[in-house]
């Protein structure tokens, strides 16, 4: 599994993460900023709203669990203490039902078999639960019987099939169909409703997502008069939380399906003061700038590799009053902050947030003010 800090007390984990951020700011960014205590969870267990569990044969029996470290050998798993209970229970029941009907797990070596992964998604605020069966082909022996038993034995909102016929380590294929119930489940963050499909990007720790986004909302200090640009906006989760308090929010994201989800979520919440566009942030934002769209507040929530150099150049040319940076990698955060501070911005503090207790992952939020 991925719980490589589980041997530390939870207070020890939070301090470890704070030290990591502080040390990285000094070493890579040459920045002397305040790094307060990591914002952790009251209960750091059972927080994950999504599980993706590979299925295989172990000792001639169908099983589902984790990959052994540095291999694709499956270790049988009866429970995972960071998965929410509903999803955990659903994985076990699904595994039992698949075994009962003699479903053949996918074999990476031969390319044969029917079932590749069991995935669950749970909506923290509504209690809605989705099961996704990732199969090698659309036809699967006893599919109707398996679906019927899942519905009888679990409290479900949705059962979805994803078809992935390719010899690949990528979990999902291109085709998805709903076998029972709704196409989506619905959750809320800061009172904003989100429709989540099998393949939607959505933060996996709903409790700490609210903590993380509150840091970003507080840092933005919106009055209702500001134009906000959200680079790397995903399905619009930060954008829509900010749209309640901004004049207009523009979001950009490279994944077209995420932009379609963002637009649908804006409509779901009747937030007409939003514009979402598919494309690279480093290409779309300069085009907006040329068209006269200038941000008062610019929000970035980039992938682990950090912000593209061209985007940082555009920020320095556009000169928004504030840059709110939400980071999942202290190293690239420190690097990008160094570029922005060399270009006239000032940062006083970097706030670590523990989104993934028991793991080494660290999220952090900072605000850079134009000097």
Task: Give names to the regions the model predicted.
Residues 46-52, 61-63, 115-119, 128-130, ...:
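Broad gene-expression machinery/nucleic-acid interaction feature
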Residues 104-112, 228:
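Short helix/loop segment immediately N-terminal to the Walker
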Residues 142-153, 157-371:
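Rossmann-like S-adenosyl-L-methionine
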């Amino acid at each position: 599994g991925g719980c490589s800090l589980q041997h530390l007390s939870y207070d020890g984990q939070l301090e470890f993460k704070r030290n990591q951020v502080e040390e990285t700011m000094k070493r890579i960014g040459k920045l002397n900023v305040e790094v307060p205590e990591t914002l952790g969870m009251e209960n750091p267990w059972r927080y994950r709203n999504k599980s993706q569990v590979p299925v295989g044969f172990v000792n001639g029996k169908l099983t589902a669990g984790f990959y052994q470290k540095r291999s694709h050998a499956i270790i049988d798993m009866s429970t995972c203490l960071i998965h929410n209970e509903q999803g955990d229970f659903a994985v076990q029941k699904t595994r039992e039902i698949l075994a009962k009907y003699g479903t053949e797990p996918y074999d990476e070596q031969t390319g044969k078999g029917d079932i590749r992964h069991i995935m669950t998604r749970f909506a923290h605020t509504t209690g809605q639960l989705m099961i996704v069966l990732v199969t090698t082909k659309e036809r699967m022996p006893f599919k109707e019987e398996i679906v019927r038993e899942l519905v009888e034995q679990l409290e479900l909102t949705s059962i979805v099939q994803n078809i992935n016929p390719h010899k690949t380590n990528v979990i999902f294929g291109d085709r998805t169909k709903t076998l029972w119930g709704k196409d989506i489940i619905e959750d809320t963050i800061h009172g904003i409703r989100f429709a989540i499909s099998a393949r939607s990007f959505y933060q996996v720790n709903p409790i700490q997502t609210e903590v993380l986004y509150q840091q970003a909302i507080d840092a933005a200090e919106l009055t209702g008069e500001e134009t906000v640009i959200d680079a790397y906006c995903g399905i619009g989760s930060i954008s829509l939380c900010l749209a309640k308090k901004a004049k207009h929010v523009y979001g950009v994201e490279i994944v077209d399906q995420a932009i379609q989800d963002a637009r649908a979520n804006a409509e779901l919440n009747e937030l007409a003061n939003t514009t979402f566009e598919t494309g690279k942030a480093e290409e779309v934002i300069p085009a907006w700038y040329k068209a006269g769209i200038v941000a008062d507040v610019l929000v970035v929530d980039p992938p682990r590799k950090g912000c593209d150099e061209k985007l940082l150049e555009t920020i320095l040319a556009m000169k928004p009053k504030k840059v709110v940076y939400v980071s999942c990698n202290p190293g690239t955060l420190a690097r990008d902050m160094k570029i922005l501070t060399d270009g006239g911005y000032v940062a006083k503090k970097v706030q670590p947030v523990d989104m993934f207790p028991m793991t080494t992952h660290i999220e952090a939020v900072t605000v850079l003010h134009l000097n």
